[in-house]
Amino acid sequence: NGNNELDRALAEGIHLCNIERNGDVVEMTSYAPLLCKNGYSNWNPDMIYFDNSEKIRLTESYKMQKMFGQHAGDTYVVSELNLPAALKRYVGTSVVKDSKTGKTWLKVVNALPRTLKLQVNGLGSKAVEVKARSSQVFEL
């Protein structure tokens, strides 16, 4: 229904997979608004909520953005996701390589209500599972 915090984060994750795929034309993304004091929201969703104590609540969107930030690369690796067309809009994938560390990351965002079992070919064949309505990063 799109009103759920997790639904929004999964949609953002699928969008970020597409952003990475088009990294040759997209130089930067941003998230706004970032901070919100509890009870004073002018816009929904915000990413980080706080109050007058030291209590901070990090949203699912924060966790999704963090996943992409911590597993960034400077080279996009062309990949193909073999799913029925009706399901592709609910799954995002992105493969990037970081030339400084030599690490290659596969990010999978699964907005489907079931676990995905994927066979990854190319940099060594391996099977991976991504739980329903979640995201995961794999080092290839």
Please provide the spans of the model-predicted regions.
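Aromatic/acidic polysaccharide-binding cleft in carbohydrate-active enzymes
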Residues: 1-93
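Active-site proximal loops enriched in glycine and acidic residues that flank catalytic Cys/His/Asp
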Residues: 30-33, 52, 80-81, 108-112, ...
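Short, glycine-/Ser/Thr-/acidic-enriched flexible segments
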Residues: 33-36, 55, 100-101, 110-114, ...
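Short acidic, gly/pro-rich beta-turn/loop elements at beta-sheet edges
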Residues: 39, 75, 116-118, 128, ...
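Hydrophobic beta-strand residues in large extracellular and virion-surface proteins
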Residues: 48, 53, 106, 118-120, ...
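Carbohydrate-binding surface patches
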Residues: 88-122
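Intrinsically disordered, low-complexity Pro/Gly/Ser/Thr-rich segments with frequent PxxP/GP/PP motifs
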Residues: 123-140
